[in-house]
Amino acid sequence: MKKKIHPDYFKINVTCSCGNNINIFSTLSKNINVDVCSKCHPFYTGQQRTSDTGGRIEKFHKRFNISSH
């Protein structure tokens, strides 16, 4: 087996926006910030979020006070 061909592994900290910290080993040498993790993602928590942000057309109608059909 050849030596020094495998990347180095570093222990890094992954920080979620919910405050959860996860320590993992990675070939990256810096810490990572993520938006969602298994602690706060709806698939893992079983809680369903409703998204009340409309599409582009709804935003346009709302901005210019146009009634939709």
From Swiss-Prot:
Binds the 23S rRNA. Gene3D superfamilies: Ribosomal protein L31. It holds the Pfam family Ribosomal_L31. PROSITE patterns: RIBOSOMAL_L31. Zn(2+) binds at residues 16, 18, 37, 40. Keywords: Metal-binding, Ribonucleoprotein, Ribosomal protein, RNA-binding, rRNA-binding, Zinc. This is Large ribosomal subunit protein bL31. GO terms for biological process: translation. The keyword RNA-binding applies. Coiled coil: none annotated. One of its GO terms (molecular function) is rRNA binding. It comes from Buchnera aphidicola subsp. Baizongia pistaciae (strain Bp). Belongs to the bacterial ribosomal protein bL31 family. Type A subfamily. The lineage of its organism: Bacteria, Pseudomonadati, Pseudomonadota, Gammaproteobacteria, Enterobacterales. The gene is rpmE.
